[in-house]
Regions:
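Flexible "arm" and connector segments at domain edges
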Residues: 1-27, 33-157, 161-224
Length: 224
């Protein structure tokens, strides 16, 4: 059932990114069905029930939202998140950045690691420092490439990606959504090239890069 649950979760994410309410409703229902499946399986095995799940959720929400259910103060969403992460760390005795699923997509995991660290004050003070760090990492990547040190280049590329995710977080840009939009744009532009080649009864192998680039430039005006 787990692979199907992962599939349903991704289908929900895609529906959310497309902004299609009817799809979102349907996919939320599918995910909810899986929640009930697991709860039912737990009940049949005498381990837990849906009531246990809901009760634990209630306890966690109350414990980690003292600004709502207690006397604590939180002025904005950032303060709420910081409070949440501190309480999680205190209650679980885990690392502040612990608790993230091992199978979480790397881009999302990078974002959440940085978000958790920032919640306890370990963060860049300004965008300027972050952009300077990006320049530094790009220079290190360039040196590794020029030296033909592929393993070092791989490590430096990872550093660049990590900084880019952090930059997106500071700008309030979801890197997953940003990359998703760029992927969609590339797909549309590339499919335009395929369409033009089909109309001309030609293949990619029969075209030089200059001709393909001309089609690409045309596609950019259609799909900016």
């Amino acid at each position: 059932l787990v692979p199907l649950t992962i599939e349903e979760a991704y289908e929900l994410i895609e529906a959310i990114l497309r902004g299609e309410d009817a799809e979102i409703v349907e996919e939320l229902g599918d995910v909810l069905l899986h929640v009930f499946f697991y709860a039912r399986m737990g009940e049949e095995e005498g381990r837990f029930s849906i009531d246990t799940v809901v009760e634990r959720l209630n306890q966690k929400l109350i414990a980690r939202h003292p600004h709502v259910y207690g006397q604590a103060q939180a002025s904005d969403a950032k303060a709420v998140l910081a409070q949440w992460e501190k309480l999680k760390a205190a209650q679980s005795e885990r690392s502040v950045i612990g608790g993230l699923p091992e199978r979480l997509p790397p881009l999302l995991k990078a974002y959440r690691l940085q978000e958790k660290a920032a919640a306890v004050g370990f963060d860049w003070a300004s965008l300027q420092g972050l952009t300077e760090k990006l320049k530094e990492e790009l220079a290190e990547l360039q040196r590794a490439i020029e030296a033909n040190q592929l393993s070092e280049a791989a490590a430096e590329l990872g550093d660049v990606l990590f900084v880019l995710v952090n930059l997106g977080r500071h700008l309030g840009i979801d890197p997953e959504r940003a990359l998703h939009q760029t992927n969609q744009k590339f797909e549309k532009r590339f499919q335009y090239i395929e369409k033009r080649l089909k109309e001309a009864q030609k293949t990619f192998a029969e075209c030089d890069l200059e001709e393909l680039d001309a089609y690409w430039q045309q596609s950019k005006s259609l799909y900016p």
